[in-house]
UniProtKB/Swiss-Prot annotation:
Protein name per Swiss-Prot or TrEMBL: L-histidine 2-aminobutanoyltransferase
Lineage, top ranks: Bacteria, Pseudomonadati, Pseudomonadota, Gammaproteobacteria, Pseudomonadales
Pfam families referenced in this protein's UniProt entry, alphabetically: NAS
Family according to the record: Belongs to the methyltransferase superfamily. CntL family.
Class of this enzyme: transferase
């Protein structure tokens, strides 16, 4: 019990602070910077060896697991709000955003190489959000064509404006329609499902209906302590799919590369 108290208490404090700051930031923009630092703190904890070891040691503790679920919900909501706020700054400094995107290319290089994403790729990105950095990198640095999906119309509006400011309108389109209702889905070479998408099995089922036989799915997810900031994928959700490349591990999330089983 003594070994788990520091992590439990730290996560409890973070959950409370993140929830309060998310509310306060809607009234006072100055709170967004504090909120960003709290989310950075959570990201840092996830990457710390001692935190990972402590989480693993106490993984069966119901109190820790329940807190983890609450913290994840708070963090996901906070990140969505923060991205919309950050979007305004990005629109005023398009040059800075361009340099930032260039620096991000190496961080997703493992996913690109494992899935075979290049300039000829057509990628449907599910759960792209207001600040779809991965999609922007693929369009700007790789030259791929993308369709970004999100159920949040406000987030789509933000992302659309960023794409316009970066001169990427010809390579990026945006929609709130389900994957099964998009013509783009039938021609897509790749499907990228964001780690913040909760209903991964439902999205996979829709994609399966319309995807071409040789298309691949990049499924970002979080398990263990990475689940504090990302939704997991359960083994049963992968029925009918085959893992076709080695899992790509990032500090905050992991990526499975999938194709239809029985090809």
């Amino acid at each position: 019990m003594q070994g788990r108290t520091p992590l439990l208490e730290t996560l409890r404090e973070l959950e409370c602070e993140i929830r309060l700051l998310t509310v306060y930031a809607r009234e006072c923009c100055g709170c967004y910077e504090i909120l960003r630092r709290k989310l950075d703190r959570l990201s840092g904890l996830i990457g710390e060896d001692c935190s990972r070891a402590q989480w693993q040691a106490d993984s069966d503790d119901p109190a820790l697991q329940a807190l983890g679920l609450r913290l994840r919900d708070a963090a996901v909501q906070a990140l969505c709000e923060l991205e919309k706020h950050l979007c305004q700054g990005v629109l005023h400094e398009p040059g800075e955003m361009g340099r930032y995107l260039g620096s991000l290319l190496e961080s997703i290089r493992g996913e690109l190489d494992s899935a075979g994403i290049d300039a000829d790729a057509r990628v449907l990105f599910v759960g792209s959000g207001a600040l779809p950095t991965s999609a922007l990198v693929l369009a700007r640095e790789v030259g791929a064509h993308l369709c970004c999906l999100d159920i949040d119309e406000e987030a789509l509006g933000c992302a659309r404006e960023i794409a316009r400011c970066q001169g990427l309108e010809a390579r990026m389109q945006f929609s709130s329609l389900p994957p099964a209702e998009l013509a783009f889905s039938r021609d897509a070479t790749h499907f990228l499902i964001a780690s913040l998408v909760q209903q991964k099995s439902a999205v996979l089922a829709q994609i399966r209906q319309v995807m071409r036989a040789d298309a691949k799915v990049l499924l970002r997810h979080g398990s263990g302590i990475k689940g504090l900031f990302n939704y997991p994928v359960e083994p049963a959700e992968l029925d009918g799919w085959r893992v076709c490349a080695e899992r790509v591990s990032q500090p905050l999330y992991d990526t499975l590369i999938l194709e239809k089983a029985g090809r």
